[in-house]
Regions:
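Glycine-rich, flexible loop/turn motifs
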Residues: 31, 38, 98, 103, ...
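Accessory C-terminal segments flanking Radical SAM cores
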Residues: 95, 135-195
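A structural motif corresponding to the C-terminal lobe/cap of the Radical SAM core domain
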Residues: 82, 101-127, 189
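Structured helix-beta-strand junction loops
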Residues: 15, 55, 125-126, 170
């Protein structure tokens, strides 16, 4: 979102882009900028979002779950709602690639369970589309909680989540790198050819 200007937003709209993904990893400038290691990133992101909104382009917020922002999740959720995000996608930190340097930010197994239960509860309170990425265990939690609540897991009650069964890498999508290498997922460096 930091590079979106009024001109870029207009071009995005003219190109027919239906939704842009914007990363926000903290509910305020101090928290977000510290994670991104870029002073001013939060404010620039907010300006970019306003440019998209002015052009009528939907946006979703992507948030990486880390030790540093775990306890701020309700505040990040509230920020997403306040700024008018169409969706909030959380990404469980996979310490691969550049994220290998963030291994100390990986949360515990119990914290993952807790955050995914919170996420399940959040989805009941909002019209935003919520999606947990790199979190196949969310779908276990969703089914367990729905069963406890007497709710059938169908597309009518859970949308596309009703049809998702675990990791989609290599089955529901693939990753193509900047040099054309095809992989089942950006985190699984299995060479499947080159475009």
């Amino acid at each position: 979102g930091t590079l979106i200007t009024p001109e870029n937003a207009r071009k995005i709209k003219e190109a027919g882009v239906q939704r842009c993904s914007i990363s926000i990893d903290g509910y305020n400038a101090e928290k977000h900028d510290a994670f991104r290691c870029v002073p001013g990133a939060f404010d620039a992101t907010m300006r970019g979002i306003e440019c998209l909104k002015a052009e009528g382009v939907e946006f979703q917020i992507n948030t990486t779950v880390t030790r540093d922002n775990l306890h701020d999740f309700k505040k990040i959720f509230e920020l997403c709602e306040r700024i008018g995000a169409a969706a909030w996608h959380i990404f469980l930190l996979v310490p691969m690639g550049r994220a290998a340097e963030l291994a100390d930010q990986v949360i515990t197994a119990q914290e993952y369970e807790d955050v995914l239960h919170w996420f399940y509860d959040f989805r009941k309170t909002t019209s935003m589309h919520l999606k947990a990425t790199c979190a196949p265990h969310y779908y276990r939690i969703m089914r367990q909680r729905a069963r406890e609540e007497g709710v059938s897991v169908t597309p009518a009650t859970f949308g596309m989540d009703a049809m998702t069964r675990g990791c989609l890498g290599g089955t529901g999508f693939c990753f193509i790198s900047h040099v054309g290498q095809v992989q089942p997922c950006g985190y699984l460096t299995l060479d499947c050819g080159n475009v």
